[in-house]
């Protein structure tokens, strides 16, 4: 799949040069322009899908489904941040897979490390040794997975993808106050889940 997705807000995927023009060409049916957009944002989309699904094969499926949907819908794109529009489609594709999986008999949980893109440093993390980072990321991924779906999505979008509250609210079609509450409760729950590994996250 794609390279590891964005690590911190400073490393967020930036818009393509002349992205508005590329989008316009894609919307008019230019497949090369559309492929250029998808290649540019592939890592971000896969990273989001993986963190919502925690399964590399399902994340790949969700990303592919999102790109197919985006190809069909790009003609109706009406502006705004293209990255957020595409990530919203990716999140919806991931939720569709989750809903289908819930209707099937349960299967063994995948290894938390399998196919995992490298997690961005959350705001409260200050790793004090390079050797501890792998273990730290593992515990973070497992803890994120234990959050309720709405809290996990909000925390991932805000603390991993660097979106502000307004962007998260727009992307998840939620009220601003609801988003703030989800992020606050999600962060508190993460602290509780990671309390026994406190030495990994403090300097």
Predicted feature residues:
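Sigma70-family region 2
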Residues: 27-28, 54, 65-82, 100-102
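Internal acidic/polar
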Residues: 4-8, 12-19, 104-130, 164
């Amino acid at each position: 799949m794609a390279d590891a997705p964005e690590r911190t807000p400073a490393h967020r995927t930036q818009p393509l040069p002349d992205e508005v023009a590329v989008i316009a060409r894609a919307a008019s049916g230019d497949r090369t322009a559309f492929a250029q957009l998808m290649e540019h944002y592939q890592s971000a989309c896969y990273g989001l899908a993986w963190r919502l699904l925690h399964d590399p094969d399902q994340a790949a499926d969700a990303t592919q489904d999102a790109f197919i949907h985006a190809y069909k819908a790009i003609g109706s794109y009406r502006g705004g941040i293209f990255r957020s529009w595409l990530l919203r489609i990716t999140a919806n594709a991931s939720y569709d897979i989750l809903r289908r999986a819930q209707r099937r008999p349960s299967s063994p949980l995948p290894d938390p490390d399998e196919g995992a893109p490298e997690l961005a440093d959350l705001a409260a993390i200050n790793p004090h040794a390079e050797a501890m980072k792998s273990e730290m990321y593992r515990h973070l991924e497992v803890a994120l997975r234990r959050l309720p779906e709405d809290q996990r999505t909000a925390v991932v979008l805000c603390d991993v993808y660097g979106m502000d509250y307004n962007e998260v609210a727009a992307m998840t079609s939620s009220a601003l106050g609801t988003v703030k509450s989800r992020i606050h409760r999600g962060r508190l729950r993460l602290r509780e889940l990671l309390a026994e590994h406190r030495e990994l996250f403090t300097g």
